[in-house]
């Protein structure tokens, strides 16, 4: 009897394994052969090769070379539209953002992306979290670690097939990300619980998220880390790129020092009004962003229903759509577009009809460094003041240049291009012309 039961169990197990193997084979064939939704009449590039299972090679090509791929046409499965469509998309509710999910002797100092983040985190943290948290070295380390590990992990997971995602919790990088999340929670939760218990409202992001949640359950630690991620990464990348551009153009630094000194002397200190009168500094930031934006395509949306644009272009439901930012290098809009010209937008301000579009924070269809439309970066005004204040201190207090024969490094990930943390500067202290 026991032998019979054992034989039956073994035979049944073999049948089950055969059944599972057959289903797995069918699923793999389906995943390989299933059609990818394509908009009729539009060219498609970067198709998966015949034996590129799960499109891993295709994903790597996109992650490493998306900007070049856009020059060839439209990338699939994301639909990249011409900037001509930006005005139609910017406020159309059918395109959903929510669904898209430095003395003569120089001393070597690294102008590291993540070291700059370490300087900007307390600044933004003071506004977002208040004095209780922003100066806590543990919070700074948790935020920096979450950013660094989070970016690497996100890029890694984009290459993996989605059916492997349940296994991600065991990936070493994912474990490191969770470690930083746990540390952030250890710091934030006592502050949040105390604030809620005392009913003390405050004008910071803790209260903002509670108000926006309107009683719905949410994870405040995730929310604060996401906000910090969005603000510190973009600010640090902006800082790194503009410092490198200035190091390559020392004559611009001389003119900027003069502008900063004159503005501070006029107003007595580094005020918001003084910053608003630094047109060359504003132009320098906008030009650096034009030449090296963080993203080469923006306005990422997902269509909630079928959409037919004004020229008859039909876009199916649930299509991931972006708008290319290539106008920022259009020679008809920006003469000699490959050249860094810090004075470009100062000169454009003299043209009356372009004057309002020349501010660093202006989001236009011809310069989408901050996006465009109702979802353009809401924190760009705060970030602009933050970066300008830091640059004023840097320009007045330090001299800097690039090491000889140092090539710039970048981190490429699809449409995103960040300055690499390996970039270094030669810097020394100088005596500033006016006290800040």
Curated annotation (Swiss-Prot):
It is an enzyme of class 1 (oxidoreductase). GO terms for biological process: mycotoxin biosynthetic process. Its EC number is 1.-.-.-. The keyword RNA-binding does not apply. One of its GO terms (molecular function) is monooxygenase activity. Its cofactor is heme. InterPro entries: Cyt_P450 (IPR001128), Cyt_P450_CS (IPR017972), Cyt_P450_E_grp-IV (IPR002403), Cyt_P450_sf (IPR036396). It holds the Pfam family p450. Pathway: Alkaloid biosynthesis. Heme binds at residue 377. It comes from the Eukaryota. Belongs to the cytochrome P450 family. This is Cytochrome P450 monooxygenase phqO. It comes from Penicillium fellutanum.
């Amino acid at each position: 009897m026991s032998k019979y039961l054992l034989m039956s169990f073994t035979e049944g197990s073999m049948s089950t394994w055969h059944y599972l193997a057959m289903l797995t084979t069918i699923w793999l064939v389906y995943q390989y052969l299933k059609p990818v939704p394509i908009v009729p009449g539009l060219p498609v590039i970067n198709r998966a090769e015949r034996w590129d299972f799960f499109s891993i090679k295709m994903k790597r090509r996109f992650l490493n070379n998306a900007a070049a791929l856009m020059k060839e046409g439209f990338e699939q499965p994301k639909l990249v539209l011409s900037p001509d469509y930006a005005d139609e998309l910017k406020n159309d509710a059918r395109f959903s953002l929510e669904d898209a999910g430095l003395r003569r002797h120089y001393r070597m100092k690294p102008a590291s992306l993540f070291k700059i983040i370490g300087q900007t985190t307390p600044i933004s943290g003071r506004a977002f979290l208040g004095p209780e948290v922003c100066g806590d070295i543990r919070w700074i380390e948790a935020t920096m670690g979450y950013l660094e590990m989070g970016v690497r992990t996100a890029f890694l997971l984009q290459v993996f097939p989605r059916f492997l995602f349940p296994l991600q919790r065991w990936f070493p990088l994912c474990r490191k990300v969770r470690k930083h999340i746990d540390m952030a929670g250890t710091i934030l939760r006592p502050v949040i619980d105390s604030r809620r218990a005392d009913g003390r409202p405050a004008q910071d992001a803790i209260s903002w998220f509670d108000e926006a949640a309107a009683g719905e359950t949410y994870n405040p630690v995730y929310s604060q880390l996401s906000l910090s991620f969005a603000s510190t990464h973009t600010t640090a990348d902006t800082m790194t790129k503009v410092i490198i551009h200035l190091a390559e153009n020392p004559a611009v630094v001389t003119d900027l020092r003069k502008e900063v000194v004159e503005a501070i002397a006029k107003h007595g200190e580094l005020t918001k009004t003084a910053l608003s009168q630094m047109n060359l500094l504003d132009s320098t930031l906008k030009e650096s962003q034009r030449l090296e934006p963080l993203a080469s395509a923006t306005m990422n949306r997902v269509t909630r229903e079928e959409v037919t644009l004004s020229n008859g272009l039909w876009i199916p439901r649930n299509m991931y759509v972006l708008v290319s930012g290539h106008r920022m290098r259009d020679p008809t809009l920006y003469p000699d577009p490959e050249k860094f010209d810090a004075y470009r937008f100062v000169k454009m301000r003299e043209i009356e009809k372009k004057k309002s579009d020349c501010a660093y924070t202006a989001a236009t269809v011809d310069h989408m460094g901050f996006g465009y439309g109702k979802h353009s970066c809401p924190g760009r005004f705060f970030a602009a003041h933050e970066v300008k204040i830091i640059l004023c201190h840097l320009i007045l207090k330090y001299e800097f240049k690039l090491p000889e024969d140092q090539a710039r490094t970048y981190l490429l990930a699809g449409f995103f291009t960040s300055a690499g943390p390996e970039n270094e500067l030669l810097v020394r202290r100088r005596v500033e012309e006016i006290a800040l």
